[in-house]
């Protein structure tokens, strides 16, 4: 599992990007990859844990969850 910080997330469009703690390419995050009940969203600056996969347009986050 990778960790990072939410760079930005657009609720209206349902996606955003996560900056990895280890550096490297920012990771795309779609709302469907967020593990939480109710409305799936992330806040700028929020710390998260996630799996990284390579999608057709670059790195994608899967199984995203908030960490303290």
From Swiss-Prot:
It is found in: Cytoplasm. The gene is cspA. Disulfide bonds: none annotated. GO terms for cellular component: cytoplasm. Keywords: Activator, Cytoplasm, DNA-binding, Transcription, Transcription regulation. GO terms for molecular function: DNA binding. Residues 4-64 form the CSD domain. It comes from Stigmatella aurantiaca (strain DW4/3-1). It holds the Pfam family CSD. This is Cold shock-like protein CspA. InterPro entries: Cold_shock_CspA, Cold_shock_domain, CSD, CSD_CS, CSP_DNA-bd, NA-bd_OB-fold.
């Amino acid at each position: 599992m990778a960790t990072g910080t939410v760079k930005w997330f657009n609720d209206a469009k349902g996606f955003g990007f996560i900056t990895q703690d280890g550096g490297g390419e920012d990771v795309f995050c779609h709302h469907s990859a967020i593990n939480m009940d109710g409305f799936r969203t992330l806040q700028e600056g929020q710390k998260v844990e996630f799996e990284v996969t390579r999608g057709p347009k670059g790195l994608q986050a899967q199984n995203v969850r908030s960490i303290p």
